[in-house]
Amino acid sequence: IHITCADVQWDIAAGESFDIDSNDERLATGRIVLSTDDGSITINSIKRSQGNPSYKGNIELALYDEGIAVINEIDIEDYLKKVVPSEMPVSFGVNALKCQAVCARSYAYTQLTNNYYSEYGAHIDDSVSFQVYNNTYDSAEADEAVIATAGMVAVYNGELVKTYYYSTSCGYTADVCAWGSDEDNYPQYASVRAGTSDYNADIKSEKTFEQFITAKDSSDYDSEADMYRWKTVIGISELTAHFNSLIGSYLRKNGSVYILENGEPSDKDCKH
């Protein structure tokens, strides 16, 4: 492993450890960069489902008020080899993994211009906030899928698509209305049936959606998934507190809120 700190560089042999904490004076001089010729770097202070994860590429260590930031600079194709098996069971098969690889690659490329972690010199993190990365063992099947689709991305009218994806659908994909945007402005995100049935219900109708969501259609791809249909119980005091914490800012922004009674708009208008 090659270690660079300021203008000083030294090497440690494979299998040896390099220990550092937030009180280490070397961090005050700038970032510490760890690299290898063609190997991986294991970080013993990080735990993932496979144990201590190993990383290709460079590891940068930088001191911030919250502690030491660990930044992994890595080639996108190598990155994808650790995203694909972390986001999809490899038991789904190589063709499904190829689809996942294209989605993950498209999403990754769209993130190269974001500024979410610019203060750390990074684009994304390794969690579900972006894409889960390096959270399971390496997989030959996932590697094969990434290699077979190398460079392939999703495009719409010549533009790269930010390919949002999820673990389980209710039988339909979501469109941009989920984020309050106009679906007509984003036709690439049209809601479609996620199954083999040709029937398409008007799930924008409150009544039709209730009928749909309370039933189960075995033709839906995710019909056997645990989260295909689910329910939860929220106490009235908890729900009231949550509602009250949000209603003030909503009214200041929107001016009024319409109260629904039995799923239909009422003539009551609550203004702030």
Question: Where do the protein language model's features map onto the residues?
Answer:
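Conserved, single-site charged/polar hotspot
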Residues: I1-H272
